[in-house]
Curated annotation (Swiss-Prot):
Name this protein carries in UniProt: L-ribulose-5-phosphate 4-epimerase UlaF
GO cellular component, one term: cytosol
Gene from which the chain derives: ulaF
Family: Belongs to the aldolase class II family. AraD/FucA subfamily.
Cofactor: Zn(2+)
Catalysed reactions, as listed in the record: L-ribulose 5-phosphate = D-xylulose 5-phosphate
Residue positions binding substrate: 26-27, 43-44, 72-73
InterPro entries: Aldolase_class_II_sugar_metab, Aldolase_II/adducin_N, Aldolase_II/adducin_N_sf, UlaF
Length: 228
């Protein structure tokens, strides 16, 4: 597990490097599917003092199997996503400013241009509000459930992120690094959408044919973006 712990540590340290977190407002995890174990950031530990061996290993029920700290308070949300989506290898949650602003506004982040379409096939959805019963009950698990409910039958790697109503963004990917990459992109396109709508409040979404071209040339079966 040491290699995975190093990857998760590095991914967590990327959050302040890319300006996605203030204080301890974020967490990254990754899963070892063969062993059924997840490595995640410890709860409330400052990035400035955090070390590789501070990463916490939990099983799929959230029980700590390795580590001296409590795992992130959002662990149950991460586990719900891993259990529902076998294609996910990493999950990240932040309170990055612009993506969180869309979450607080209760609005999806609209697909307005090709930067968005290179990573997200359509709008980045916003969940419904959690009920009082859902919040007072198993809050973090129910957060995972409302993300799953909102995505429906969408392939999660085609929409590698979401904003949870009045809370903030979650993103995911093939591994921890990929999840953080998608979280960085989500914050950037959230900022771009806010600026663009300020310039032109009546701005239409990106045309479907342009969105399809940009997404498929990077992620489709005949993708040709980048190097082999």
């Amino acid at each position: 597990m040491q290699k995975l712990k190093q990857q998760v540590f590095d991914a967590n340290m990327d959050l302040p490097r890319y300006g996605l977190v203030t204080f301890t407002w974020g967490n990254v995890s990754a899963i070892d599917r063969e062993r059924g174990l997840v490595v995640i950031k410890p709860s409330g530990v400052a990035y400035e003092t955090m070390k590789v061996d501070d990463m916490v290993v939990v099983d799929m029920d959230g029980k700590v199997v390795e580590g001296r700290y409590r795992p992130s308070s959002d662990t149950a949300t991460h586990l719900a996503l891993y259990q529902r989506y076998p294609s996910l290898g990493g999950v990240v949650h932040t309170h990055s400013t612009h993506a969180t602003a869309w979450a607080q506004a209760g609005m999806a982040i609209p697909a307005l241009g090709t930067t968005h379409a290179d990573y997200f096939f359509g709008d980045i959805p916003c969940t419904r509000a959690l009920s009082e019963e859902e919040v007072q009950g198993e809050y973090e698990l129910n957060t995972g459930k409302v993300i799953i409910e909102t995505l429906g039958e969408v392939e999660p790697l085609h929409t590698p992120g979401i904003v949870v109503y009045q809370h903030g963004p979650f993103a995911w990917g093939k591994d921890a690094h990929d999840a953080v990459h998608n979280a960085v992109v989500m914050e950037e396109v959230a900022r771009m959408a806010w600026i663009a709508r300020g310039i032109n409040p009546g701005l239409n979404p990106i045309d479907d044919y342009l969105m399809n071209k940009h997404f498929m040339r990077k992620h489709g079966p005949n993708a040709y973006y980048g190097q082999k």
